[in-house]
Each structure stands twice: as C-alpha cells, then as structure tokens.
Amino acid sequence: LQEKVNAFEVTQARALIEGEVAAIAATTINEEELARLHQTLVDMENSQFIAAADKEFHQIIANSTRNNAMILSVENLWKLRSSTPEIIEDYDSVCSKDNSKTLSEHRAIYQALKSGDATQARNAMHSHFNRLINALFDAVETRALDEIKRKNDEKRGLYSIPDTSSNIR
C-alpha cells in the first residue's frame, strides 16, 4: 500500500491532520514548546538546517497536543514523506526552491499558536499545505512538459529534412 501513496495524498492528509493538530495545539502549547518552535524558525533561516528544522517544527506542534494518536499520525506521515522515492523526489523538487515562503508560513502558524487562536492556527496550517500542493502540481506539470519537449525534439531530429541548399552550385 505504501508504494501506491503519492505526494498529493500525503500532503492532503498532512493538511487535514496537521490543521487539526495546530488547532488543538493552540490551546495546549506551553511556553517551553513555543520557545523551541521559535528556535526552529531561527534555524530555518540557515539553509543547512531547513529540512531538519521543518520536521522539528511540525513535530513540536504535534507533541504539544498531548494526544498520542495525533502525534503518531504526524510521525507516520513524515515517515511516508521521507521513505518513498517518488514522494521524496516530488517534495525535493519544491521544498528546496524557495525557503522564504515556507518560513513566512511557519511564522504565521507560530503567531497563531502563540496567540492561542485555534481557528487561525488551523487556517495558517491549511494555507501552508495548500501552497505546497500547488507547488507540487507546478513541478509535476513542468516535468511532464519537459518530457513532451524531449520527445518532440527526438521526433524533430528523426523527421526533419536536412537543408541541402548550401550544396547546390
């Protein structure tokens, strides 16, 4: 079953589950967890730590719910995200591009959690994943167009008539 799961399914599941996780966390997160969450934002500004800080950000939020089923759900979705080659490739193609959007979205989630606003936290998390889903669609579309261009270039070479006008005197 794991091989049949794609990046869109994982991302949709993450959006739905982590949206609710964020809503719960807005009412349960403590000061120490908020401080650790803030540190992940600082770490994300350093390109060396983006992936690790991103994962930690989401884990801290899940852990702050104190709900083991939610924590396990988030952990399992991260395992799917990082253990299926196709999903890894799809995520890498969009997550490595522009960190500023992810950082901005994480800041919005952090602010909602800090203010204790469950609705705002859910909405901020949904916005974060909606952008990711759209970026995944853009990446898949670009790959498909590149493949079409590659195939057309092969055919162009196969069917084009060579220009012989320079050989005529």
Language model feature labels by segment:
Residues L1, D90-K97:
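Short helix-coil transition/hinge motifs at the ends and kinks of transmembrane helices
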Residues L1-I17, A23, T27, L158-R169:
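Short linear motifs at protein or domain termini
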Residues V10-I88, S104-H106, Y110, Q120-A135, ...:
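Conserved amphipathic alpha-helical segments that form helical-bundle/coiled-coil interaction surfaces
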Residues N99-K101:
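Short helix-capping and inter-helix turn/linker motifs at the boundaries of alpha-helical repeat units
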Residues A118-R169:
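C-terminal effector-binding regulatory domain of bacterial HTH transcription factors
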